[in-house]
Amino acid sequence: MPKRGKVLHKEDRKNSVGRLLFVIVAVIIQIIWFWFFLYYLTESYLWASIFAKVLAAVMVLGVFSKRSNASIKMTWIFIIMAFPILGVLLYLLVYGSGFTKTMRKRIEAVDAMLFPYLDQSHLILDQLKKENKVVGNQFSYLENTGKFPVYRNTEVVFYKEASIGLDAQLEALSEAKKFIFMEYHAIEDRQSFGEIKAILRKKVEEGVEVRLFYDDVGSIGFIDPKFVQEMEEWGIQCRIFNPIVPMVNLFMNNRDHRKITVVDGQVGFTGGYNLADEYFNIHSPYGYWKDTGIRLRGEAVGTLTLLFLEMWHAMDDSPVRGLYNYLPRHWERYNGQGYCLPYAYAPTDDMPLAEDVYLNMIQSATESVYITTPYLIITDEMSRALCLAAKRGVDVRIVLPGIPDKAFVFAISRSYYPQLLRAGVRIYEYTPGFMHSKQLLVDHVLAAVGTINMDYRSLYHHFENGVLLYESPCIFDIADDFYELFRTATEVSPDKGHNRSLFTRMKQGALRLIAPLL
């Protein structure tokens, strides 16, 4: 297992944690104030009490009729019925955010300008369907729902370690001639990003356009508040996704979890790792950090370019200009085999595209389904799909962390073990440390690699991206990585699914009830 530098003990983050704590405390105080105010009204005035009960009943009906996942609806109905005042208040805060609607309109407007630049001829998709109708339908869903085209002229390389991927990124960045786009959930201004930053600064001096886009919450414990100012002084354009403010606005719950690097529109990177030291085992608070990534070279990079521009322009409603400067009009011939389709999900979408991709893949499996994920907090639909696959004889295996980064979330993940184990799903825990890669491999020919965890946050609440691959040579490398994990990890005994005590059942039931909100 390669190391990038000296392993350090976990240190206190001094940078912007104070701002995050201030915002959290301010929001909690506001919610408590609203709750006490409404509680006072309902206790002091009969009309207010009646109105609150009627509103709660109406809200329950509204939640029930909402086009959403059943588990999420059930959790909200329980909260509203058990705690009418607080439940109604929280629900309105989460789903009544005007900014969410504004963001949806911005993304739709930007997409209307961007996506016509992608090849929507369906010729490659038609060819794929002739070769394999079932797999072709997987790609067809993404073309029909998200307008994401499938490509052939793309070379794909899989990196089984984040540190190897970072080295490849550094090399690609150093060769940039026109532009560099980077979008990440978390950036830490220390050793690993320091290497990137030095190259970016040099490239700006050479006349290369550099844009950096990152999520505020994901990076808040990693970078200094003056980070943006420093980047812009160097000539690096920098934008922050959904900056947190000390005001009640539950769109803060929707974060940008995408991870994209694009160089000159010809080379693109994505995968599970952010640009922070712990992802490259420079800093190891949770044992060995296991993460993966991929590099695309060729036509499929066009989709990654547009995904970056989508978020860049949607965040501040800026005009879209000069797209042909970023999308090559003529492509070189690459040694790309198989089919490649980059895609993305946004919580403003009408369809749960991220979950649907995984469900479609699992339901089409005839031999094997291999999954890596840091979290296992799944819907009833996903749980049923995994169980049904195992019961029809498919070899279903899931690899999770051996050392979790969040003990409470890990306890919820383990609450799903009994049902899956009883159905024949094999579960592994990565003994050396924290499993952070997000991969799904079906029948050794179809794979998805990207940023999407098997939890509600990725499947419903976050902005995510991934790449769907079919018969790409790199799938052999992905399969080898899985088999190495199976040898390294510890398999959970099937007995874990039997003989649970009443207390354990009650605890797991309570955890599962709140799981959709996490």
Locate predicted features.
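Helical hairpin unit composed of two closely spaced alpha helices linked by a short loop
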Residues: 375-396, 401, 406
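Glycine- and other small-residue-rich loops at beta-strand/loop junctions that grip anionic moieties
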Residues: 185, 374-375, 409
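C-terminal structural cap/anchor segments
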Residues: 394-398, 402-454
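Exposed, interaction-prone extracellular/peripheral surfaces
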Residues: 357-361, 381-387, 391-392, 412-415
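A short, conserved beta-strand element enriched in hydrophobic/aromatic residues
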Residues: 291, 372-373
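N-terminal localization/anchoring segments of enzymes in phospholipid and broader phosphate metabolism
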Residues: 1-356, 360, 364, 404, ...
